[in-house]
């Protein structure tokens, strides 16, 4: 069992990583006998894990209610969020309740925002079931729902009480979802850790076949990097923005194409290449490193071009609504070398459009 701490003073919390955690009541810290829980999951995961998690919590004396939501990015909305509030109020659940998010990034983000909002804030626990959520979205306290005009535009910074990563969940993960998660894994190597990027080049095949030791190391390293960044810059005033490499372009793809048609990791992968191309055009990133990135993404089965249905101009309205925009000016996360990156303002629309055009599908 691996345990990493996200250090935030009184709001510090553990990330527990191991196989078989759903069999151990102690995994679900800080829950204890007599606590009340609302378990939030989706219709795909409920048949796989709901009874198992409910059972282990009830054996520990926890009182468990549940709400099952539809599955998909398109349901990360205010309308579906209201379903959670209604379930909480009908029981009713008070301020001493704990929400447990059993699912991927959609469930985690939506449940976290529900916890931040319900009765002005209740405790919640992240139980991520996808690779993407295990390495990224469950850690750090970003919670949100989407708006038709932009992804994650309505939300709050609100930290979980703990994160429970059961590696066994990856055994039921569809191949496309596994691949999507690898985009966020590769991102960490590009922005923060050249040695990890090199390790990924040598161990990608092991990750694709769900090799246990390789996957455990991969998730642990990503969580270590994320925990360090969040501890240093919880509210994304500087360093944490680096974690958004590829996301300004990627969120534009998700919004323009319709949430769920491109998975988040797929859109981010294409966005990473666009960011690399933009950095190349500014003379601060080598074409050789861009090719290393493209080669690794392609080996993972990820797209390295944007959707053919989108023109370069289609990206700009979405990108100008990005949360990093200041005074109407685009700010992009750009790689400087493998393992090193920066947030740069003042990137011209000409450079951005040219970088997108470099990555358009024929």
Curated annotation (Swiss-Prot):
It is found in: Cytoplasm. Pfam families: DHQ_synthase, DHQS_C. Keywords: Amino-acid biosynthesis, Aromatic amino acid biosynthesis, Cobalt, Cytoplasm, Lyase, Metal-binding, NAD, Nucleotide-binding, Zinc. One of its GO terms (molecular function) is metal ion binding. Its EC number is 4.2.3.4. Binds 1 divalent metal cation per subunit. Can use either Co(2+) or Zn(2+). Pathway: Metabolic intermediate biosynthesis; chorismate biosynthesis; chorismate from D-erythrose 4-phosphate and phosphoenolpyruvate: step 2/7. Zn(2+) binds at residues 184, 247, 264. One of its GO terms (cellular component) is cytoplasm. CDD domains: DHQS. It comes from the Bacteria. NCBIfam families: aroB. Catalyzes the conversion of 3-deoxy-D-arabino-heptulosonate 7-phosphate (DAHP) to dehydroquinate (DHQ). This is 3-dehydroquinate synthase. It comes from Salmonella typhimurium (strain LT2 / SGSC1412 / ATCC 700720). The lineage of its organism: Bacteria, Pseudomonadati, Pseudomonadota, Gammaproteobacteria, Enterobacterales.
């Amino acid at each position: 069992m691996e345990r990493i701490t996200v250090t935030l003073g009184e709001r510090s919390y553990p990330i527990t990583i191991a196989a078989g955690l759903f069999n151990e009541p102690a995994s679900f810290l800080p829950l204890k006998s007599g606590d009340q829980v609302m378990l939030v999951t989706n219709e795909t995961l409920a048949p796989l894990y709901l009874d198992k998690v409910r059972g282990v919590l009830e054996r520990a004396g926890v009182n468990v209610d549940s709400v099952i939501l539809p599955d998909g990015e398109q349901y990360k909305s205010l309308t579906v969020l209201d379903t959670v509030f209604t379930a909480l109020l009908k029981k009713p659940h008070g301020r001493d309740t704990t929400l447990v998010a059993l699912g991927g990034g959609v469930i985690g983000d939506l449940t976290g925002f529900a916890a931040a909002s319900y009765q002005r804030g209740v405790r919640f626990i992240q139980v991520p079931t996808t690779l993407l959520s295990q390495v990224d979205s469950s850690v750090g306290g970003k919670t949100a729902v989407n708006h038709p005009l932009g992804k994650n535009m309505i939300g709050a910074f609100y930290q979980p009480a703990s994160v429970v990563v059961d590696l066994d969940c990856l055994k039921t993960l569809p191949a496309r979802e596994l691949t999507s998660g690898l985009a966020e894994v590769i991102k960490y190597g590009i922005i923060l850790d050249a040695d990890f990027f090199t390790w990924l080049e040598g161990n990608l095949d092991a990750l694709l076949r769900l090799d246990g030791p390789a996957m455990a190391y991969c998730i642990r390293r990503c969580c270590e990097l994320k925990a360090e960044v969040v501890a240093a810059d919880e509210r994304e005033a500087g360093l944490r923005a680096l974690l958004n490499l590829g996301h300004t372009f990627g969120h534009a793809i998700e919004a323009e194409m319709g949430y769920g048609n491109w998975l988040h990791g797929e859109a981010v992968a294409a966005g990473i290449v666009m960011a690399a191309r933009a950095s190349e055009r500014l003379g601060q990133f080598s074409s050789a490193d861009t090719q290393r990135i493209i080669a690794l993404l392609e080996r993972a089965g990820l797209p390295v071009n944007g959707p053919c249905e989108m023109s370069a101009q289609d990206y700009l309205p979405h990108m100008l609504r990005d949360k990093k925009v200041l005074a109407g000016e685009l700010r992009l996360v750009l790689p400087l070398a493998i393992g090193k990156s920066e947030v740069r303002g003042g990137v011209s629309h000409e450079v951005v459009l040219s970088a997108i055009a470099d990555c358009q599908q024929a």
